[in-house]
Amino acid sequence: MKKILTILALTLALAAPALAQNTTQKINKKNLVIKEWNTEPRSGKKVLDHVTTFDADGKKIEEIEYGSEGQKWRKRFEYGADGKCVKEMVYNDRNKLETVKKYEYNEFGRKKTQYNYNAKGKLLTIKVFEYIAEDA
């Protein structure tokens, strides 16, 4: 029994730093910019692939996707007083507005309706979200 307890204590002592490291690796997203890079295998050249920007509250406010020729698209996000995303604007490679998505939420804070508009404000489609929970 003493052997088992000793082995268990040693195992926990060795695993503790790894467990602590996992908990400290959580990223604080406040005022954070995440840049993703691709590296070309032959030349070793780094190419910017994606940039995500968060505001002081940790909310994602912008995403930009890049290709070899530069920016492919850009998305901007706006939030309501409750912290939920209420508007998403998508811009093309020339930073020209292409589409706008507006969101409504249900009483549980889940997306209820998504309205999709073109750049001129014309309603294109409406997406309704349905949540079905089955009891186990």
Q: Where on the chain are the PLM-derived regions?
A:
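Positively charged n-region of N-terminal signal peptides that target proteins for export
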Residues: 1-7, 21
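Bacterial N-terminal signal peptides
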Residues: 7-15
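Sec/Tat signal peptide C-region and signal peptidase I cleavage site
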Residues: 16-20
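Buried hydrophobic residues that stabilize the cores of well-folded domains
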Residues: 21-136
